[in-house]
Amino acid sequence: MLYFIRRFIVWLRRARYSRGFGVQSPWAYRFIRYVVNEHYPYYKYEQLDEQVNGIDKRTRKICKLYFRLANYQQPRTFLDCYPTSSCYKIYVNAGCQKTHYQKITKETTEEDCLRLFSNVGEYSMVRIPLIEDYRSLVDKALEHLPSSSVIIIENIKRNKEAEAYWTELVSDSRTGISFDLYYCGVIFLNKDMVKQSYVVNF
């Protein structure tokens, strides 16, 4: 019940940003409409609900976003930073079976981090929650990932520090188009498109 109350409050605050309304860019509109807020009941959702147990509703919602993003991006690699379960891996691989899974943990050395970021390949997805030494990790990602990559930053509204950091990333010269989904932020590194930041009622 508490989840639904919080979700409703967030929805009310962002109601004017629903479904891509008011977005001028055709590409951004399609991404919001058909990836972020796509409500089509993919047949795999039911299978994944049975396969992935023990996660809360918000995590399930984000997992489904990762599924759709993987289906859209068709990433060569999904680099998962500080995973606490295999749920994101399972949903990403369901969205794109060819995706190679890699992870960064507390035990991963700096040398290995650089190697992983440098070798992810084109159109890859990188998940970074704002925990541990996230600033250093994001900086390495921005320096070494190919421009076709997309980074998902989780916990961007956790506290004022996280919100301020997200604002920094949106303005960073190394980032391209970004989407503030409240529960997470999505950053594309392709700078061929006009840089813009969108707030989306996800």
Where are these regions (language model features)?
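A short alpha-helical cap/connector motif
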Residues: 1-147, 157-202
